[in-house]
Each structure stands twice: as structure tokens, then as C-alpha cells.
Amino acid sequence: MSIKHFLTLQDFSPAELKQLMLRAIELKKIQKSGEIFEPLKNKTLAMIFEKSSTRTRISFEIGMSQLGGHALFLSPRDTQLGRGEPIEDTAKVISSMADGIMIRTFGHEVVEKMAEHSQVPVINALTDDYHPCQLLADMQTYYEHRGSIEGKTVLWVGDGNNMCHSYINAAKQYGFKLRISAPEDYDPNPRIVEANQEYVEMIRNPMDAAENVDLIVTDVWASMGQEEEQKKREKAFKDYQVNTAMMQQANPDALFMHCLPAHRGEEVSAEVMDAEDSVVWDEAENRLHAQKALLEYLMAKA
């Protein structure tokens, strides 16, 4: 039997992604009711973190605990990875003992190589190219507040980064139109755009791009590893802040999302972050429920 991995949204069909979202909502209700539900009892998830994290670590650790399993935290300091052990060797060893591997790292090729040599499911918890777990939470959050996102129009404002790339994949998999508004020199990977071009439109002016959209999403201007570019990026992105004026260009029931952490006064104004149409806190909580559905799907029968 072939092993199922989750490296990008394209690893699952649209039907699987919808099933996963509905299951996440069910698991959320189960958890809120206080019912004990442990389909992953005696299962272990090895979590490899080469990038620091708040929401990812907490949500996966608590998720495994609530599902009856155990999560093992591994950093480069704790393993031979930090001393140069090949990824393929690490994958073979860890997958011979653990029931699943979650990895948060820099190069996407690291995750791909891990999956290639693993005997158990591998989950991409973020690379420089993609952040698919966040999209599971975002799509669940939109569904809970506004229903199906199919046929809607979403605006990504800011850096064409890993989150933007996953939104491009999501446009195809969930059936929405995606507008991307980024400064020159900060567009998403053209290869990823071209592969999904019928779902994606590039609009340089962010106020024009925001007109009549149903959801506006942004992220920090300087991601992890780009701190030295902070001043340069602040200058390049100064007209790309999501603020009240931009939200007023959108449809009256448009939502605002941000994967967090957010820098109020930079990529988003404090007013928008704390407004009624901001669902960032539900979005953050849904990392837990969406990933529980993913863990159950990949590991319960493995």
C-alpha cells in the first residue's frame, strides 16, 4: 500500500480536502463537548522543527494528545540532523519507530526527500515554498463563517511567499478566484502561478485589487530568515497595508485573515486586526482542529 503524504494541497483531491474540512468541524464539536475520542491511541508523531514556531508546535502537540497519541519534539540541536546526517538516513530511522513525521524547515526539497525515504506519512508544517496546513485552517474558518468558498474571490496582499503559493494551490483545489497584489520584485514564483493561471489574476494596485472581494489575506512583510531586509521591505510594501480603506473596497461581508504573528501598523492596521470581520483568532484555533483531521486521516489506519 502506498503511503499518503501531505506536502502541498495538491497531494489531496478536492473531494479529499472537502472531506477533511468537514471532519475538522466534527472533531471541533467533539472536543468542545468534552467527549474523549482517541483514534491515535499509542501512536507517535515525530515533529522536526528547523524553524521556530508557536501555533504549529502547540496545535500539533495538543492535537496528538487530544487524539490519544504522543508528539515528540525534535530540533536540529537534539538530533544528528544538526550535525549533517543526510535527510534520507534520518527519514529511514525515524519512520522505523514513529507512526508519522511532521517537519517544519527551510527548503521544500528537504520535505520531499523526507517523504521519499519515509515508511510513514510525512506532513509539511511549513517550508520556504508552501504552508499547506495553514490553508486547511483558513478554508475551514471561511466555511464556518460564510459557507463554501467555491466561486468566491480572494485577495492576497503583500509578499508572494509560501503562504501566497499555498493560496494559489488552494484556488484550484477549492474552486475560488485569487487576486494577488504585490510590489514589483515580490511576486510569487511564476512557475506556480502559470500552473494555476486560470484561477489567478495579478493586480499591482492593491486598492483596485480589493474591489468586491470576499476575503482579504496578508502576511508579514519579512518572513523568518529575511530580517536583514526589514527596512528595504517596509519601503517596498508601504502601500500594501490592509487597512479600513482597503476593507471598504471589498464586499460588505468580506472577511480578513492573517496566519499570525501579525505586526500591527505594518502589513495590517490595528483597526482591521481587531474589527468584527477579522477572523484571525478563529483561524488560529482552527489550526488545531484542521490538523487533527489531517492526523486522523493519515495515521489512524496506517
Swiss-Prot record:
Its EC number is 2.1.3.3. GO terms for cellular component: cytoplasm. It comes from Hydrogenovibrio crunogenus (strain DSM 25203 / XCL-2) (Thiomicrospira crunogena). Carbamoyl phosphate binds at residues 53-56, 80, 104, 131-134, 259-260, 287. Its main location: cytoplasm. It holds the Pfam family OTCace. It comes from the Bacteria. SUPFAM superfamilies: Aspartate/ornithine carbamoyltransferase. GO terms for molecular function: amino acid binding; ornithine carbamoyltransferase activity. It is found in: Cytoplasm. The lineage of its organism: Bacteria, Pseudomonadati, Pseudomonadota, Gammaproteobacteria, Thiotrichales. This is Ornithine carbamoyltransferase.
